[in-house]
Design a protein with these regions (language model features):
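Gly/Pro/Ser/Thr-rich low-complexity, intrinsically disordered segments predominantly at protein N-termini
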Residues: 1-188
């Protein structure tokens, strides 16, 4: 997601994190804070299209799940303290929401890769999301025109799709996202 995560020197606590200015975007991995760069236009355009599709589906089903775009905090661990801001997440357990953040793993996460630091989405976040209980994780890479889907429930499966594909959202029975429509709309 972020092109240049810059680690800060000291470990931070939840209290220190909450004291940061609201306009400062930071993620914390194992107590180390990383500043996040601003996303690009294509990043935000993809985010908007996906959030719109996901939210429309959930509303049409009158479901309990909620869609949240970044910045919205997810505290995935207290020990070690880890808090992330996925580009898009879906939370189906309202008890995880406290008005300020999601406490625990969302059901579904999408990260949109920015060119400066793709390893963060492909490696570090995939590791954290798998280990802390995310059910499904998509990595949307506009530069490579690829979507990597990690299904962390049941038999672990990772599948790569092109932007020409229609992809099933497995946490729902009948939701499919046609990436060729998104690519055409955004001219990517």
């Amino acid at each position: 997601m972020s092109p240049a995560l810059q680690p800060q020197s000291d470990t931070v606590t939840l209290e220190q994190y909450e004291a940061l200015p609201e306009d400062r975007r930071v993620e914390v991995f194992d107590g180390i804070a990383y500043d996040m760069a601003s996303p690009s236009q294509i990043h935000q355009s993809i985010l908007l299209e996906l959030c719109t599709l996901l939210n429309a589906y959930i509303k049409s089903k009158e479901g309990d799940c909620r869609v949240f775009p970044a910045p919205f905090d997810v505290k995935i661990s207290d020990h070690p303290f880890t808090i992330v801001q996925p580009d898009i997440m879906i939370v189906c357990d309202k008890n995880k929401l406290d008005g300020n953040r999601c406490n625990g793993a969302p059901d579904f996460i999408i990260e949109i890769v920015s060119p400066g630091n793709p390893a963060d989405d492909y490696i570090r976040k995939a590791h954290y999301y798998q280990n802390y209980g995310v059910r499904e994780y998509w990595i949307v890479d506009p530069k490579r025109r690829m979507i990597t889907v990690h299904y962390f429930e049941g038999n672990l499966i990772n599948v790569a799709y092109s932007f020409d594909a229609t992809i099933k959202v497995h946490i729902f029975d009948d939701l499919y996202i046609n990436f060729s429509d998104i690519a055409k709309l955004l001219n990517i």
